[in-house]
């Protein structure tokens, strides 16, 4: 269904375009869309060594960044191209990542934009809310013992 390939610094531009396409609707809904800010935030947090491209039939379908953070893992970026959404790809990718985390016995933490579709997606996959601030909600998933 999909395969991961390693990202490089050369992937920055196409991944920031993917980020903007994926988040635009949610950001516009709350009056927070600013293309330049979205680009700058991604530039400040893009770590190619922790980023995997999600490829479907040889084409970029998304990306995910998962790396060590405190005593667990931080899922910092997870974007599925709008044309690929609604087909189970996001769930398949997340389930693979959670299996990797479970094999290591590590929790996975993340933050999502308030009122985005991502909130429901992560709750459906066993994440529980751990905190919130003005625009973001924080979640954690823990492996079963």
Map each language-model feature to its residues.
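A short beta-loop-alpha structural element at the N-terminal edge
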Residues: 3-17
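Conserved GNAT-fold acetyl-CoA-binding loop/helix
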Residues: 17-43
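Conserved active-site tyrosine of GNAT-family acetyltransferases
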Residues: 42, 122, 127
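A short helix-loop-beta-strand connector motif used in the catalytic cores of GNAT acetyltransferases and
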Residues: 43-53, 62
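Conserved beta-strand in the GNAT
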Residues: 59-67, 74-79
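Conserved GNAT acetyl-CoA-binding A-motif
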Residues: 72, 101-114
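Conserved acetyl-CoA-binding loop-helix of GNAT-fold acetyltransferases
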Residues: 80, 86-99, 123-124
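Conserved beta-strand-loop-alpha-helix junction that forms the acyl-donor binding cleft
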Residues: 85, 109-120, 132-143
């Amino acid at each position: 269904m999909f395969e991961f390939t390693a990202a490089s610094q050369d992937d920055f531009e196409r991944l920031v375009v993917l980020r903007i396409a994926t988040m635009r609707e949610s950001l516009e809904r709350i009056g927070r869309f600013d293309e330049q800010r979205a680009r700058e935030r991604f530039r400040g947090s893009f770590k190619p060594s922790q980023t995997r491209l999600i490829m479907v039939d040889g084409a970029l379908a998304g990306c995910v960044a998962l790396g060590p953070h405190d005593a667990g893992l931080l899922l910092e970026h997870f974007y599925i191209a709008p044309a690929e959404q609604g087909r189970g790809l996001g769930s398949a990718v997340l389930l693979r990542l959670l299996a990797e985390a479970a094999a290591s016995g590590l929790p996975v933490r993340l933050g999502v934009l308030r009122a985005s579709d991502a909130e429901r997606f992560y709750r459906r996959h066993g994440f529980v809310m751990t905190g919130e601030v003005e625009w973001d909600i924080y979640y954690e998933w823990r492996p079963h013992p």
